[in-house]
């Protein structure tokens, strides 16, 4: 969904599953909704705000570059096939396969019936089903993977392909990762943690992961790292015996940051944390301070400036 120019930590679990599938011999293809992104997946309560075509195109190019660099996946844009479909062809070739009662029975649609849902959002399901059909026919895609909130859209695609071609295809969903309170995992103080290091520094990622809840860290090691079962069990033992050392937390931060940005960025984040928490401020460069606190939070003052002047 190209609503931003970078992926965030909330996306990471599904991408890592696709990475595991790739290592097992499969060929993952990331679909970016350059077409559907201009409409928006129905939300449980309100309609999503539209974003401009120019912004969608910019976001697509940024996401494509990021995914190719980090994960090595092929990236496609569904606007490439939607731009050639007119409304008559859409209704004749695809709409006829969708029963309105079937669509109304989808959970996300049912929850919006009382408050109202536009036809734009209502038709989103058909477009996602069409995506699966196109990729199946043109790219040989037989399995669609997504978060569990996309189950209804995936099954719509499976049904469309079966009805129109007789082919059997499959869906694979994964639960959304949450913290111990059931809140979506991957935000710090309400803000997204971006995978683009110019938007979220490696230091901020490090601080986030070394401070995850003790009760959840082993589960996160299983989801977000490629450590072996035996290695994770060893970290679990260490965490139980000496939780104050936070070895499992540090391993989580190390594995994720090294995977995303490389060993050098991880070591830099550890070094910055050491300087900050051991009061070694004199050794920090201006760029180090900007990474620690964000350049927008840094102000230059003169030696004789008072607090009143600053305020």
Feature map (PLM): residue ranges:
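Conserved nucleotide- and phosphate/pyrophosphate-binding catalytic cores
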Residues: 163-311
């Amino acid at each position: 969904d190209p609503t931003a120019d970078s992926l965030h930590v909330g996306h990471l679990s599904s991408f890592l599953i696709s990475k595991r599938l790739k290592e097992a011999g499969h060929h993952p293809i990331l679909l970016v909704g350059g077409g559907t992104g201009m409409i928006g997946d129905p939300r449980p309560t309100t309609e999503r705000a539209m974003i401009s075509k120019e912004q969608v195109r910019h976001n697509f190019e940024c996401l494509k570059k990021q995914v190719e660099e980090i994960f090595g996946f092929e990236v496609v844009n569904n606007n490439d096939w939607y731009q050639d479909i007119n409304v008559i062809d859409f209704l004749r070739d695809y709409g006829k396969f969708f029963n309105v009662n079937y669509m109304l029975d989808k959970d996300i649609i049912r929850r919006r019936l009382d408050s109202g849902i536009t036809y734009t959002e209502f038709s989103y399901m058909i477009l996602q089903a069409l995506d699966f059909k196109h990729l199946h026919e043109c790219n040989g895609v037989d399995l669609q993977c997504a978060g569990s909130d996309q189950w209804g859209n995936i099954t719509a695609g499976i049904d469309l392909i079966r009805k129109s071609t007789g082919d059997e295809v499959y869906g694979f969903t994964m639960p959304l990762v949450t913290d111990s309170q059931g809140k979506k995992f991957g935000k710090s103080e309400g803000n997204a943690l971006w995978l683009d290091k110019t938007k979220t520094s490696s230091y901020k990622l490090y601080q986030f992961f070394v401070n995850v809840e003790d009760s959840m860290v082993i589960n996160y090691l299983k989801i977000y790292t490629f450590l072996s079962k035996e290695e994770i069990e060893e970290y679990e033992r260490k965490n139980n015996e000496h939780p104050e050392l936070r070895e499992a937390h540090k391993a989580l931060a190390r594995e994720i940051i090294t995977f995303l940005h490389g060993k050098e960025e991880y070591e830099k984040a550890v070094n910055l944390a050491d300087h900050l928490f051991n009061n070694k401020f004199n050794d920090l460069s201006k760029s180090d301070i900007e990474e620690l606190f964000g350049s927008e939070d840094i102000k230059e003052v003169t030696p004789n400036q008072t607090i009143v002047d600053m305020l």
